[in-house]
Amino acid sequence: MVTREPLETFSVPIGPQHPALKEPGHFLISVDGEIVTDAVVRLGYAHRGIEKAAEGRNWVQNLYLVERICGICSHIHATAYSLGVERLAGVEVPPRAQAIRVLVAELERIHSHLLWLGVAAHEAGFETLFMYSWRDRETIMDALEGFTGNRVNYSANLLGGVKVDVGDEQRTAILKALDYLEPRTHHYMDVVTTDAL
């Protein structure tokens, strides 16, 4: 009779197509018992040719193109592009426009974090946390819509500035959303770190 030692070290391949992945990607996770010892990530399965598409457009048209790289984080792509073009052209963006770009980016970041918290909760089978985080994400999306006029591609950037301004009504709506979300995020942190699920 042949006896073997239990295999403690092994690799777990995930992807490129997997129900838990929202975008195609290949991950090779090496584990030693319960400890992840290495991870190899291979992306690029969803290459869309943005670079090639940009070659045939002008500077302004490309701003709209890069906004559509990702529906969740459209503003930050457009901001990065705008900053690059502005630096190349030697254009200085007014401080208020810089502040507005940061405000939209931070609201977008909160929206993204709540979205992915919900996705992670859903994949872990924690449907209540999924529903709560997506419900609360709507407060940020509503604030962004009231601020920029759009819920997905905010289209707030112009080369050299921004298309939107913050008035009293927008400021009040944004602060109200943030006041609502602050205790909720602390609650989510408690749920994620202490819940027995």
List the predicted regions and their residue ranges.
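Active-site bordering "gate/hinge" segments
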Residues: 1-197
